[in-house]
Each structure stands twice: as structure tokens, then as C-alpha cells.
Amino acid sequence: MALNKEDILTWLEEAKTSEVVELITAIEEKFGVTAAAVAVAAGPGPAAGGVEEQTEFDVMLVSFGDSKINVIKEVRAITGLGLGEAKALVESAPKAVKEGVSKSDAEEIKKKLEAVGAKVEIK
């Protein structure tokens, strides 16, 4: 009985890891090959002078403006910090409120802080 590719793939999906390892070892011995990853030549990179798009952003509190208390409340809501920690963060502006967030999250945080009078930058 000849096996086709689908039969082999179905068996691999259902096989235990130890069975797959045994199969790989048997193939290596039978054909004198190794299962090491093959180094592939890198394809063409981005266009010359292209800039990689940033995926993580930091939300920086530049200043708290005229409504320090409201900014502290919003910083607490955004970060989950305690009152003293949030107050220290706000008073030490310019300071990162959140680091390594997505662009949409950074924009949302910026809107919330600006709504209570803070000056905010996204880096």
C-alpha cells in the first residue's frame, strides 16, 4: 500500500512527540541526513533608506498643566499605581506614564490625559 502526502501529514498530526522524534532519527540514519535547519539566503530587504515601522510606543507626561489633581487621578486609573506613586510620577514630569504599548493604546492614553489638562507626547 502506497502512502500519499496527506496520509503522512495526518499521521504526523496525530502522533506523539516521541514517535515523531523516532521517525526523524530513523530518516537521518537511513538517508544520512540531519534535521538541522537549513540556512536560507536572506531575501531582499526593505527599499534602500526604508525605515522600519515602530510597533511599541512610550507615553510621556510632559507637564500636568493647571489640574494636577485630575492628572494624578487619571494616571492612577491608567497605571494602577497608588496615590503616592502616581503623585510622584506626575510631579517628576517629564516622565513615562506607560512604556512599550501599541500605537492605539498610546493614542487612547494620550487623549485621556489631555482631557484632564496634561501635556503628553508619544515617543
Swiss-Prot record:
Entry keywords, A to Z: Ribonucleoprotein, Ribosomal protein
Gene3D superfamilies given in the database record: 3.30.1390.10, Single helix bin
Signal peptide boundaries: none
Listed GO CC annotations: cytosolic large ribosomal subunit
InterPro entries in alphabetical order: Ribosomal_bL12, Ribosomal_bL12_C, Ribosomal_bL12_C/ClpS-like, Ribosomal_bL12_oligo, Ribosomal_bL12_oligo_N_sf
GO molecular function annotations of the record: mRNA binding; structural constituent of ribosome
Assembly information from the UniProt record: Homodimer. Part of the ribosomal stalk of the 50S ribosomal subunit. Forms a multimeric L10(L12)X complex, where L10 forms an elongated spine to which 2 to 4 L12 dimers bind in a sequential fashion. Binds GTP-bound translation factors.
Record-linked PANTHER family: 39S RIBOSOMAL PROTEIN L12, LARGE RIBOSOMAL SUBUNIT PROTEIN BL12M
Name this polypeptide is given: Large ribosomal subunit protein bL12
Species, as recorded: Borrelia duttonii (strain Ly)
